[in-house]
Amino acid sequence: PYTTLFRSAMRSFILGGKFSMASLSLKNVCKVYPNGFVAVKDFNLEIADQEFIIFVGPSGCGKSTTLRMIAGLEEISSGELWIGDKLVNDVEPKDRDIAMVFQNYALYPHMSVYDNMAFGLKLRKVPKAEIDKSVHEAAKILDIEHLLDRKPKALSGGQRQRVAMGRAIVRSPKVFLMDEPLSNLDAKLRVQMRVEISKLHKRLQTTIIYVTHDQTEAMTLGTRIVVLKDGIIQQVDTPQNLYNTPNNIFVAGFIGSPQMNLIDATVAQEGSQVTLKMSDDVIIKLPAEKSKKLIDGGYVGKTVVVGIRPEDVKDDPEFIAAHADSKFVSTIRVYELLGAEVNLHYEIGDVTCTAKVNPRTTARPGDEVTFAMDVTRLHVFDKETDRKSTRLTPVTYTSRMPSSA
């Protein structure tokens, strides 16, 4: 039954349809399977016309399921899906004016590139001259004009993906849905295709919803990113805000490479100053303004989760002198040279942490090295709240823009 539904829906995509607007609205959308498994829970999101929205999260988080519900490949269990001013829960995929690009290219092997791109238009009985114009325009955009006479077997992976995108472009849809389109490509091609997709969005000025598990794709492509875990939205924000002001511990650890260092710490008060004890040897003093926030929040004597990005921990003497209240000593366990930077792995208590430092560092495994943290870039998460729900209330020192999550 699912295979039949899938094939029927894919045929509907090829036949196409039209809408006057490309904005989307998902209101309390849920997906529950017959066995009771909840794949997507209470999904609320407003997508503006011409936005490039990324759904990102680990495997099984519900991102592809949500995309398939938007496409019409999956039935919505409850909630509402609007495209423009029309409720489309029960609208056939062909009438949603949506084009989808999959992880596998799904090209017809016996057809040329031209015929693969033109196939959907031929089914819709579009005049031949219009088909020819649309195919050549899309091929020019994607730089595959010289490939139009070739068969898919004669193409590279990147070229096949361009053809798959071209097949979607010729339909002039209002919304593109892309389900991990680059995951079958090697690392070099992924970088190239990321650039091509970004250019494509700017040129076409259409709405794109893009699913990936790769945070690099998410951060480099999206105007906004939806971070998902266990079918629940964790945060919706711009790439910069996600990185600088994560909404909870999951987002803090998921976004960023190397990931944010997350360490349990006890909050103590000495007069008007607060200290964060991360281990017997690592105690960080906070300035008055930051201390007051934790005191007023009732965190003195409690255990919190402290987050600090690897690039905000340095072994540079000048940096250490400027951040003397946050300096500490640790033994280097692993040294990773990455060309323009070095990752030093060390420990705070029983937690392995990372510092992203200048490649001219002299630190090597086994060395005891003095580090310091930039406390203005420190995040403090409420561990008690973490135990009560999957959504944490952050006590963070940097301002956070409103999130729709």
Residue positions per predicted region:
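Short, small-residue-biased leader/transition segments that mark boundaries at the very start
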Residues: 1-5, 392-396, 402
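Short coil-to-beta microelement around the adenine-binding A-loop and adjacent beta1/P-loop entry
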Residues: 36-38
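The feature captures the beta-strand-to-loop junction immediately N-terminal to the Walker
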Residues: 56-58
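Helix-to-loop junction immediately C-terminal to a conserved catalytic motif
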Residues: 71
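ATP-binding/catalytic-site motifs of ATP-hydrolyzing domains
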Residues: 80, 86-87, 232
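ABC ATPase nucleotide-binding domains
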Residues: 93-254
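Glycine/charge-rich catalytic "coupling/switch" loops of P-loop NTPases
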Residues: 273-332, 362-391
